[in-house]
């Protein structure tokens, strides 16, 4: 799993995930499933933010060209991925500036258009159960919750999905990609089931090679939120080709 993570995700995302785990005394080389989950969550948070800006009229717009415009500001403030001290500093600054209530737990994003903190979830389990767990933990109607699953489902507070359909589809396609690449290497079952993960760890199973013809390398171009991978889900033709390649994967 560790090899898969380092190959599938941009190095800067991997580095952030490693720092996050070490801050809590966890070892990415041992808790590899958590390592993969944190990288996935980080990437979804960055994708959620990418290309979304607020214009001079306060309207939300999407800009993908990278053409600089001084009148535009990022719609989302990314809190996830920062060390705890810096993250709380950012949260306190937002609360002092906007007047919103300070959340009890660190959220993932702040939405300047809707003036609310946002909690992003990525689950391998039943989405409704995971959503309720998040809601019960946060216990605040003022923090917006948006959950994505690896099966293409999503659930959000009051069915308010915040982003346009295309932006959400990019996230779902990326999660689909991650799931299929894990499955092609025999890693998906252990990622979903902790019991299976322990069994594989005891047997010291090695990861299988990637599916023939399946892209496993990422480009390292700069995105608006982070120097993250160039999204291969951006182009519908490439997405269709990618899905077709999954169907042709040979089971070993």
Curated annotation (Swiss-Prot):
Gene3D superfamilies: Influenza RNA-dependent RNA polymerase subunit PA, endonuclease domain. InterPro entries: PA/PA-X (IPR001009), PA/PA-X_sf (IPR038372). It comes from the Viruses. The record marks 195, 198-199 as: Important for efficient shutoff activity and nuclear localization. The record marks 202-203, 206 as: Important for efficient shutoff activity. Its main location: host cell. Plays a major role in the shutoff of the host protein expression by cleaving mRNAs probably via an endonuclease activity. This host shutoff allows the virus to escape from the host antiviral response. Hijacks host RNA splicing machinery to selectively target host RNAs containing introns for destruction. This may explain the preferential degradation of RNAs that have undergone co- or post-transcriptional processing. This is Protein PA-X. It comes from Influenza A virus (strain A/Chicken/Hong Kong/220/1997 H5N1 genotype Gs/Gd). The gene is PA.
């Amino acid at each position: 799993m560790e090899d898969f993570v380092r190959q599938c995700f941009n190095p800067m995302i991997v580095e952030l995930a490693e720092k996050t785990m070490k801050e809590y005394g966890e070892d990415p080389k041992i808790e590899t499933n958590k390592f993969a989950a944190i990288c996935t969550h980080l990437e979804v948070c960055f994708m959620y933010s990418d290309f979304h800006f607020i214009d001079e009229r306060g309207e939300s717009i999407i800009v993908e060209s990278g053409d600089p415009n001084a009148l535009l500001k990022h719609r989302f403030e990314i809190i996830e991925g920062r060390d705890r001290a810096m993250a709380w500093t950012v949260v306190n600054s937002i609360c002092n500036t906007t007047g919103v209530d300070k959340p009890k737990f660190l959220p993932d994003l702040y939405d300047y258009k809707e003036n609310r903190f946002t909690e992003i979830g990525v689950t391998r389990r039943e989405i409704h159960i995971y959503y309720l767990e998040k809601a019960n933990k946060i216990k605040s109607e003022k923090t917006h919750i948006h959950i994505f699953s690896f099966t293409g489902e999503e659930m959000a507070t009051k069915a308010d999905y915040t982003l346009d359909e295309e932006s959400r589809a990019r996230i779902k396609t990326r999660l689909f990609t991650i799931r299929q690449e894990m499955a092609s290497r025999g890693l998906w079952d252990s990622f979903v089931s902790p019991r299976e993960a322990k069994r594989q760890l005891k047997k010291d199973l090695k990861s299988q090679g990637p599916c023939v013809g399946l892209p496993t390398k990422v480009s390292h171009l700069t995105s608006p939120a982070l120097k993250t991978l160039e999204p291969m889900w951006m182009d519908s033709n490439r997405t269709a080709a990618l899905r077709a390649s999954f169907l042709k994967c040979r089971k070993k």
